[in-house]
Amino acid sequence: MGTIGRRARELAVPVVVCALTLGVYCLYSVGQWRMMASPSWDLAIFTEAAKSYSQGHWPIVPIKGPGFNLLGDHFHPILVLLGPVYRVFPSGLTLLIVQNALLAWSAWPVTRAASRLAGSAGGFVIGLACGLGWGLQGAVGAQFHEIAFAVPMLAHGGVAFAQGRYRACMAWLAPLVLVKEDLGLTIMVAGLVLAWRRRDQGRRALAESLAFAAFGAVAFVITTQVLLPALNPAGTWAYSLDGSATGAGSSAGGAAAAKVWPSLIEILTFPSVKIATVLVCVLGAGVVGAASPWFALVVPTLAWRFMGSVDFYYGWSSWHYNAVLVPIASAALLDVLGRAARWRDRRSADEDRALADEAGAAAWRAERVSSWWGTGVISVGVATPLLALAATAPLLPMWQLTSSGFGQDGPRAEAAHQAMAAVPAGSAVETDITLMARMVPDHEVYWVGSAKDMDPLPEYVVVDQRSYVWGGRDVTAVGWATDAHPGHSYELVFERNGFQVAHRTS
């Protein structure tokens, strides 16, 4: 009974942290769904991919273009795992819940490891700072993306590194190549870090680590230079190394413009939000975690973002690009705390020696500074992530939960449902972002404009006149459709509260 009770106490803190994280994220996602919040078209795109996988097909995504294979956009075959779940729960909300579960899972190994090093209270603080970390909140706010699968892998792999379980570390990180093409570079850096850490463990350990680094590099080259071009309609990698689109992400294709590279100082500091992003990442590692070689794993992700020309790659408070940085920073902190705990624990052993003889007393005095240093490092490492999270909370997505109106059906909800009901199930429809993800389960959905080369054209056009995608222009469903598809005629079949549905009559 004693063993069972001890085991239960060990698991209590991680269970509470993961449950709290999952609960907060699901509360937010359901609220977003009810409010019809649509930060981008990405949720609809991934919902179409999950729908195709659930039917045993390639991830064909009409939103990107007729017959577009999403594996030619980014390389994320791990998304096939969404198929069975979507088959049971066919909704875009399903993907949001799956993502929340994956992100909450990442707090499990971090909390358990932190509790062993810093006690239950310290474990709770570090685990919560990881689970509700800045980058994970941004991912939840931006809705589903493939990197959700990478977060628990990086968390488990990083904790294994901090605990000296290096083969387990490699086993957890290897599947990252199935999540997104650039993560092969993260594996490469991890292999080099492992080689450095294991440099005194013999040739075999060194060879394993370097082989792992080579695996990551080769995987990156194969996915970007062979697999993605083979699957992309334009026959090329749709994104450059800096993450910016080349114009070849759809069947329309396009050539990348000549790139003028800025100086290293400009890459790192301009605009200044890049400095803030790095600072928040360091604070997430408790500051002291930046001393761990594991912290180097943030470099590939920050590099392609900072070298890019897309403004929202640079920030720290929104979007999903920072999600992979959170478990890396947390694991780096645990790595340093592990060493600090060993310094701290020397004191009790040396104190016993001091009681035995004068030589022991001298040794104890020599070690006491190291012990105090270890205790200080642990204190800073535990407190800093929590303080950083508290200080930045008002700027992060979950702060919206404090608003009294968050999660409530808006005044346009009824009109939105009526607009969707006006389109028969099974029909092909062109639409903007607002209702896109909601229409995927029962319709063949296209982005407004992606179906221009189709024959026949989609039967319906659904427009939200208040959607931000129209840039404030006065758009009507019939007007847009007749302009986009000359020679065809449309009639308005529904209009209410800014939502319009047009039916193609010829």
Give a label for each model feature:
Residues 296-355, 361-368:
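Hydrophobic/aromatic-rich transmembrane helices and adjacent perimembrane loops
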Residues 93-117:
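Transmembrane-helix motifs of polytopic, lipid-linked glycan transferases
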Residues 27, 45-69, 77-78:
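Extracytosolic helix-loop segments that constitute the early lumenal/periplasmic catalytic or substrate-binding loops
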Residues 28, 38, 42, 52, ...:
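Membrane-lumen/periplasm interface segments of specific transmembrane helices
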